[in-house]
Design a protein with these regions (language model features):
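Charged, low-complexity intrinsically disordered segments
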Residues: 1-155
Length: 155
């Protein structure tokens, strides 16, 4: 199985930090990350602060501080899916996503996010050979592959 395990370089467009105008709650955000972090709260002051964040990194930092909406755990996957559908709704972005072929998409990371992505873990076989595996739920990768398949089916 072929794997894209880094959303950097030529695959940066897969990252939630890459520029892509998406709308949430009538506001047009510069990245999926901005919109996702704003969606975590119902507090309009926090949403506005995230809207004006100068970078997706700053938006993510602010999102860690917001008072979470009560239903967040139940809706966060749906929110992300909706934002990703917007991001990959243009011809250019659909084409880029389709160009990943059938490769397995893994949001590989070193910061320990095993919900949206996966973390590379060193393992040892009984023969004392070292190998690496990805551990995590990889929800971002799964959503991207789902959307890619739906785009392919619509062709």
């Amino acid at each position: 199985m072929l794997v894209i395990d880094s959303f950097r370089g030529r695959y940066r467009f897969l990252s939630n930090f890459s520029p892509a105008i998406v709308v949430y709650n009538k506001n047009a955000y510069p990245t999926v990350e901005h919109a996702y972090q704003a969606a975590k709260t119902l507090d309009e002051d926090w949403q506005e602060a995230i809207f004006w964040a100068k970078s997706p990194t700053e938006a993510k930092r602010l999102g860690r501080k917001v008072p979470l909406r009560e239903d967040w755990e139940q809706i966060k996957l749906k929110v992300m899916e909706d934002l990703l559908r917007q991001k990959f709704s243009t011809f250019e972005m659909k084409s880029k996503l389709l160009a990943t072929g059938n490769e397995h998409l893994v949001e590989g990371n070193t910061w320990g996010d095993n919900f949206w992505g996966a973390v590379k873990v060193k393992k040892l076989r009984f023969t004392y050979q070292t190998y690496y595996t990805w551990e995590g739920k990889n929800h971002l990768g799964k959503l991207l592959m789902k959307i890619r398949e739906e785009i392919r089916e619509d062709l």
